[in-house]
């Protein structure tokens, strides 16, 4: 597979994976790809913990599902991320960013305009939306054959210092290498983010994984092989839309947006789902 093809096909997997274990060969390839990422002064600040134990995965899935339910029930999630929610194709076409909630139960569709109001939050809780989403999230994580914890060396990751930026930047490059490699291997990947949204929940995962004091747990991902047909959850979104080049590229200085690049280049095809 060509690199540009993998970049264009890269996506986040919102649905379930096949139950098949990820082969050790593929695990090694993924982590080799991560280790080949660039880093400031070749510091290689990243560390990874590979998780296959069903009990550990089950415990993390419980923490993730409970976190999602809580963050959505109390409104903190919607308040924090409301600039990125889209409920119509027209809005997505205008903004060209965020998440388009294009799959919703019929009972909820009339209330999308109220989702960020107190009444909307009450309605969602009445309909059990946070609980439904939390349980679906738990099942997705629990059904994943492989989790990957991403850590940084605290001797390099020192918040408030320039080394912290370098470390996070390097970690991002390592994770992008993994993400692109999943495309080549017929796999999917998704960030397990909700435990970071609720105070105390991330600490539970840190304890569960026995992360030592000299490392900082930065992220946890779920990975697995993709089924031939991917089933979408009851409430789902798409995020394939991308900003036009003239919206994020400038020429010579920041007063001059790039011109003539808004049309997709030859061979680009349609963007990936996320």
Segments and roles (model prediction):
Residues 1-274:
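Acidic, surface-exposed loops and disordered segments
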């Amino acid at each position: 597979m060509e690199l540009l093809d993998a970049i264009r096909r890269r996506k986040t997997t919102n649905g379930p994976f096949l139950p098949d274990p990820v082969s050790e060969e593929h695990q090694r390839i993924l982590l080799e790809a991560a280790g080949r990422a660039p880093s400031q002064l070749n510091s290689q600040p990243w560390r990874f913990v590979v998780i296959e134990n069903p009990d550990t995965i089950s415990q993390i899935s419980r923490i993730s599902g409970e976190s999602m339910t809580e963050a959505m029930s109390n409104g903190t999630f919607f308040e924090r991320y409301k600039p990125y929610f889209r409920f119509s194709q027209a809005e997505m076409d205008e903004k060209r960013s965020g998440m388009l909630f294009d799959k919703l139960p019929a009972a909820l569709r009339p209330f999308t305009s109220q989702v960020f109001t107190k009444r909307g939050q009450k309605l969602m809780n009445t309909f059990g939306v946070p609980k439904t989403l939390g349980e679906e999230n738990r099942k997705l994580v629990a059904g994943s054959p492989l989790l990957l914890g991403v850590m940084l060396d605290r001797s390099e990751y020192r918040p408030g210092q320039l080394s912290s930026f370098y470390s996070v930047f390097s970690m991002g490059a390592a994770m992008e290498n993994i993400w692109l490699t999943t495309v080549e291997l017929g796999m999917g990947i998704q960030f397990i983010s909700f435990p970071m949204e609720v105070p105390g929940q991330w600490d539970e995962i840190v304890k569960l994984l026995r992360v030592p004091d000299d490392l900082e747990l930065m992220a946890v991902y779920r990975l697995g092989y993709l089924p031939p047909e991917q089933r979408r959850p009851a409430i789902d979104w798409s995020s394939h839309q991308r900003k036009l080049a003239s919206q994020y590229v400038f020429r010579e200085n920041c007063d001059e947006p790039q011109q003539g690049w808004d049309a997709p280049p030859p061979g680009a095809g349609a963007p990936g789902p996320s």
